[in-house]
Design a protein with these regions (language model features):
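Hydrophobic/aromatic residues located in beta-strands of well-ordered beta-sheets
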Residues: 18-20, 64, 121, 184
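N-terminal glycine-rich phosphate-binding loop and ensuing alpha1 helix
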Residues: 1-21
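A conserved hydrophobic position in a structured secondary element of the catalytic/binding core
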Residues: 22-23, 74, 150, 197
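Conserved core of the sugar-phosphate nucleotidyltransferase
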Residues: 75-164
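Short phosphate-binding loop-to-helix
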Residues: 19, 25-84
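Short, high-confidence coil segments that cap the C-terminus of an alpha-helix
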Residues: 15, 61, 88-91, 182
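Conserved alpha/beta core of the MobA/IspD/sugar-nucleotide pyrophosphorylase nucleotidyltransferase superfamily
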Residues: 139-213
Length: 213
C-alpha cells in the first residue's frame, strides 16, 4: 500500500523529492528492500503534520507535502490540485476536497469542509456541515481529503502551538492552524480517495487497484 502512494507521489512532476517518513523498523526495511527513499522519525509524533515537521528539521525545502501512507488511491491529479493554491505566495497551508457522495454526508469518518468564496477553509468537521435546516437538498457537501501542503514557516510554527480545543474534540489536526489564525486554502478535485482504516476498506481498495493493473 505504501508503495502505491510513493509511486503516485513520484508521478507528480511538481514534487522534487519524495520520502517515506516512518517510526517503524518494518516499514523502513520494506522501503529499503524496494528502493523507496525513506527516513526514520521519532515515535512521539502525534500527527502526520508533526511527522512532516520532524523531516523538515533535517531536510530543507520551501514547501512540504504530507500524504498519508494509508491512501493508496492518491493520484498525481490530487497533488496538482493541492499545490495549485500554493502558487499564491500568501497561502501558507493548502489541502484538497472532493464533492461528498450522498452516503458519506452523515458519516463521521468522512470529514466535511466548508470554505469562503476564495477557497479559504472556514471549518472542518466530522459533523454534517453545513446543516440543511430547511431540507432544501441543494447543498453541495464537500469531503476533505487528508493531504496537505505547508510552507516551511507554517510547518515550523505548528508544534509550537498548543493543541486546540476544537482539534481535541474533532480529532482533526488541521483545526490547530485555523484556531491560531493560519488560513488553509482548499483545492478542488473530482477524484475521491479511500483511506484504509478497516478490513472492508482494504478489500475495496484492493479491488479497485486490481482493475487498474
Amino acid at each position: 500500500m505504501i508503495a502505491w502512494v510513493y509511486r503516485a507521489a513520484r508521478a507528480c512532476s511538481l514534487l522534487d523529492q519524495v520520502l517515506i517518513a516512518t517510526d517503524s523498523d518494518e516499514v523502513l526495511e520494506f522501503a529499503n528492500a524496494h528502493n523507496l527513499a525513506a527516513v526514520f522519525t521519532p515515535e512521539d509524533c502525534a500527527s502526520g503534520t508533526d511527522r512532516v515537521h520532524a523531516v523538515a528539521e533535517s531536510i530543507g525545502a520551501d514547501i512540504y507535502v504530507n500524504i498519508q501512507g494509508d491512501e493508496p488511491l492518491v493520484r498525481p491529479e490530487h497533488l496538482d490540485a493541492l499545490l495549485e493554491p500554493m502558487a499564491r505566495p500568501e497561502v501558507e497551508v493548502s489541502t484538497v476536497a472532493v464533492r461528498c457522495a450522498p452516503d458519506q454526508i452523515n458519516n463521521p469518518n468522512a470529514v466535511k469542509v466548508v470554505t469562503a468564496q476564495d477557497g479559504r477553509a472556514l471549518y472542518f468537521s466530522r459533523a454534517t456541515i453545513p446543516y440543511d435546516r430547511d431540507n432544501a437538498r441543494g447543498i453541495a457537501y464537500r469531503k476533505h481529503l487528508g493531504i496537505y501542503a505547508y510552507r516551511r514557516d507554517a510547518l515550523q510554527r505548528f508544534p509550537k502551538l498548543p493543541p486546540s480545543s476544537l482539534e481535541a474534540a474533532e480529532k482533526l489536526e488541521q483545526l490547530r492552524f485555523l484556531e491560531n489564525g493560519i488560513d488553509i486554502y482548499v483545492g478542488e478535485t473530482p477524484y475521491d480517495t479511500i483511506g484504509v482504516d478497516t478490513e472492508e476498506d482494504l478489500r475495496t481498495v484492493e479491488a479497485i487497484l486490481s482493475k487498474d493493473r
